[in-house]
Amino acid sequence: MAEEIYREWFVRMRFPAHEKVKFVKGVPDGWEIKKLGAVLELCHGKALKDRDRVPGEFHVYGSSGVVGTHNKAMVKSRGLIVGRKGNVGSVYWPDRGFFPIDTVYFVKSELPNGFLYFLLRSMNFINNDAAVPGLNRNQAYSNLFILPPAPLIKKYAEVADSQFEIKRFLTRQNEYLTSMRDRDLPRLISGKFAVVYLDIQFPPSMVEPAHET
């Protein structure tokens, strides 16, 4: 839903009260054409080889997504990640601190992550002229986009944040249930997990009717 609202407001230009706004050459009054480099900084990740990782609570991110965990976060809070090598232009939004390795950039910006996430995903970062595929920062910074007014960005970010919070909650619940299954199923199969004393209630459709004798 958050992506569809982004497209509706900032691509199709059907944002709230758009019918009352004057458009000049396709740009709404009060909006600005900006270079990406004017609103954010792409910062290099840091090499972290497998042998140097200490398993922990923080995800390690490469351009293909999560590639492991570590006990320390290079970036202490939520932020955005952009693929630099390999899966060029991939965009991730971790739900906690994280460790970006040297195949990605992490983003610094004053704009809300909820808005930037879909803005970055809409960008074409592929450089077809490069001998080795990769995302050049200067090339990325030169991408043009139309920057909405701050109140509209804030309004959208509130919508996006709430949608992502629901998604993150469901993801954490699924991870918890999966860990419980992986922990308890082998014990159940081997007979080490006693179920005889559990108060298991079956639905009526699963209960066989009692036979009269």
Predicted regions and their residues:
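DNA target-recognition domains and sequence-specific DNA-contacting regions of bacterial/archaeal
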Residues: 25-148, 196-213
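Short small-residue beta-strand/loop micro-motif enriched in glycine and branched aliphatics
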Residues: 100, 154-155
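Short histidine-centered catalytic/ligand-binding loop motif
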Residues: 104-106, 156, 166
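Non-catalytic DNA-recognition/assembly elements of restriction-modification systems
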Residues: 1-8, 12, 16-62, 150-154, ...
